[in-house]
Amino acid sequence: MAKDLLLEIGLEEMPAHVVTPSRIQLEEKVIKFLDEHHLDYETVQSFATPRRLAVKVTAIPEKQADVEEEVKGPAKKIALDAEGNWSKAAQGFVRGQGVTTEDIVFKELNGVEYVYVTKFTKGQSAKEVLTKLNDVITSLTFPVTMHWANYDFEYIRPIHWIVALLDDEVIPFKVLDVTTGQTSRGHRFLGDDVTFQHANEYEAKLKEQFVVVQPNERKQMIVDQANALAAEKNWQLALDEELLEEVTNLVEYPTAFVGSFDEKYLSVPDEVLVTSMKEHQRYFDVRNDQGLLMPHFIAVRNGDNVHLENVIKGNEKVLIARLEDAEFFYNEDKKLTIEACVEKLKNVTFHEKIGSIYEKMQRVALIAQIIGRKVGLSEDELEDLKRASEIYKFDLVTNMVGEFPELQGIMGEKYALLQGEKPAVATAIREHYLPTSSEGELPETAIGAVLALADKLDSVFSFFSVGMIPTGSNDPYALRRQTYGVIRIIEDKGWTFPLVQLQTEVDEAVNQDVEKYGVLLNEGQAEVVEFVKARLRQLLMTKNVRHDIIDAVVSAEQADLSKLFASANILKSRFEDQDFKPSMEALTRVINLAKKGQELLGDTEEGIDPSLFENKAEKELYQAVNDLSEAFATRTIAENYEALVNLRPLIDAYFNETMVMVEDEKVKQNRLKQLMQIAKMALSIASLDLLIVK
C-alpha cells in the first residue's frame, strides 16, 4: 500500500529573503533523494514559514523495487592473467558488486571484450530508506549560517524540532541532538504544540494553531485583506510584489490593518515617505483616486486581530520616528548648495586604485561629451549634458541619501530642481542610474541615456585598466550588470556605437591629464570588448535567438553594438527564408577560401587586377562587389545583408566557372583577393560560416 511522507524542519525565525529559496531547495533535494533511492511517488509539495521548512510527498510505495542491473567491469585482457586465471582486478570488481567470478560474462563493446556481471539488489522498506533523510536536512545550503551550543555544524538558524512521518509512523533519525517525532509547534504566541496522527493532517492541524504553512495561501490572505481595507476607504493600493513576497515570509498567520501619520509629513517627497514605509517598516503605501499619497498605510501583523488597536499604535509610533528623521534630513539638505556638495566629493573615495568620486565625475564629463557627439546630440543638449555630468553625484553627500542610499539619483533630481537646475539636467541626474536590474526601467531622455552610458563605461574602463576584472561569480563592483545596462540602452536607442573607437578616444583623452582624472587608462582594451560581447550573448539568449546565430554575431569582426544587434535581428528574422540556406552556403564557401587567402597573403593592401580575369563570371562578380562596396559603410545592416544575399547567383556562377586554387600564382592570388573582399563585408555582419543551416 502506498503511503504519504511528511518532513518538517522546525527552526528559529529565518530571514525573509531566505525562506522561499530554502523551501525550493528542500523540495528539489527530497525529489533527488527519492529518485536516487528508487522510491516512486505521485506528488511533492513544499511548505515554508519563517519558523519551518516542510515537504509532503504522496503515494510512496512500502518498499523499493528490486533492481537488476548489468554492470561493466575491466577489459578481458586485464581480467585474466597469462595463465587464464582471474586477476586481482577481476576479483576486486566482483567483490565490490557482491557477486563472484562465476557470475562473469564477456561482452564486446567497440571491438573490445569487457567483463560484465548482473547485480541484483533487493529493495529495502521505504521507512528504512527514509531514515537517511537526515543527510538531506544537513545538506541544505544558505547565504549566511550560524552555529549554536557546542556544535561545529552550521545552519541558517538553530533546529528545534523535526517531524518525519510515513503515514502514521515516525521515521527514526537524528540531526545533532534533535530526534524526529510527530509533534510540531504552532504560532509562537497564539498556538500550542500539535501532534500529527497522520502525515495528511499537516496543513489543517497547524492552521488550528494559527500557522498557515502554504506560502501562496498566506500571500492571498494578505492581498485579500489589504484590498478590502483599501476598498473600504476608497483608496488606491498597488501592492509591491517584492514587498508582498517579503511580508509573506515574515508571518505565519497574517492580519492586515490600517495605520496613519500626520499630514505634515506629506511635505517630504513621496519617494522618501514610501521608502521609509517599505524598506524600514514593510508597510504598503496608499493613494487617493487622483494618485496622491495619503497619510495612511496598510501593514500586516503576525497574528490575529485581538488587541489590534495596540499593534496599530505601536506601528504608528515607530513610523513617526522614521518620518521625523526624514523631515529633518530633507530640511537640512535644502540648505546645502550643489557646489558645496560637489566640493565634498573630492574627499569621497570611489576606489583606492581609481581615485575619488569627484575624479570619476571629471572622467564621466569627458566621456559623456565624446558619446554625446557620436550619437548626434544638439549643442543645447550637449550643454545640458555638460552641466549634468559636472554635478550628477552631488546627492551622495546629502543627509537623505546617507540615510536612504536607495534614493540616490532620485533625491539628486529633486534637490537639483529646488536649486534652479534645468529639468533636463535634473532628469539626467536621476536617469544615470538606470537600468538598476537586468530588466529594469531604461533612461527615457537622450541626455540621461548618454550620462548613464558614460558613468557605466567609465566604471568598466577604469576597473579593467587597473586589472580588476570580474572572475567567476566574483563581481563586487557590478561591472556585469553595468555592462548589460550599456547594451540595453544602446539597443533601446538604436545609436551607432563603435566601442573600440570610443574606448581609444576615451583612453587618449583621459591619459592626457592623469592628475586631473585620477587613473591611467592604458590596459584592458581587448578584455573590455570581449567582456561586452559576453553580456551581449547573455541578452540575445533572453530574446530566444538561436545559439548558432549568437555565436556568429558575437564572433563577428564588428564592435559596433548597434550593428551587432541589427545582425542578430536580421539573421533571426530571415532564418526560415527559402533562400537563407543556399545564400549562407555560398557565403560560407567564400569565407573559407578567403581564410586560405589570409594565410597566404596576409592583410594585403594590393588591389584586384581585372586584367587577370579569365571568364565572364569573374568580371560580373567583381563589378557587383565594387558597386556594393562603395555604399557598404553607409548602409544599414539589413540593407547590406540583402545585398550580400543578392550576390548569391553571381557567387554560384563564379564557382561553377572558376577554379580558385590554380597553379598560376598570380591568378590564384587575384582570385583569393576577390573572395577576401566579399568575405570582409560578410564577416562585418556576422561570422556567417558559424551558422548551422539545414
Swiss-Prot record:
Superkingdom: Bacteria
Taxonomic lineage of the native organism: Bacteria, Bacillati, Bacillota, Bacilli, Lactobacillales
Protein name (Swiss-Prot/TrEMBL): Glycine--tRNA ligase beta subunit
This protein's record includes keyword Metal-binding: no
PANTHER family assigned: GLYCINE--TRNA LIGASE, CHLOROPLASTIC_MITOCHONDRIAL 2, GLYCYL-TRNA SYNTHETASE
Description of how the protein assembles with itself and partners: Tetramer of two alpha and two beta subunits.
A single cellular component GO annotation: cytosol
Keywords: Aminoacyl-tRNA synthetase, ATP-binding, Cytoplasm, Ligase, Nucleotide-binding, Protein biosynthesis
Gene Ontology MF term list: arginine-tRNA ligase activity; ATP binding; glycine-tRNA ligase activity
Presence of keyword Repressor: no
Family stated for the protein in its record: Belongs to the class-II aminoacyl-tRNA synthetase family.
Enzyme Commission code: 6.1.1.14
Catalyzed reactions per annotation: tRNA(Gly) + glycine + ATP = glycyl-tRNA(Gly) + AMP + diphosphate
HAMAP family found in the cross-reference section: Gly_tRNA_synth_beta (MF_00255)
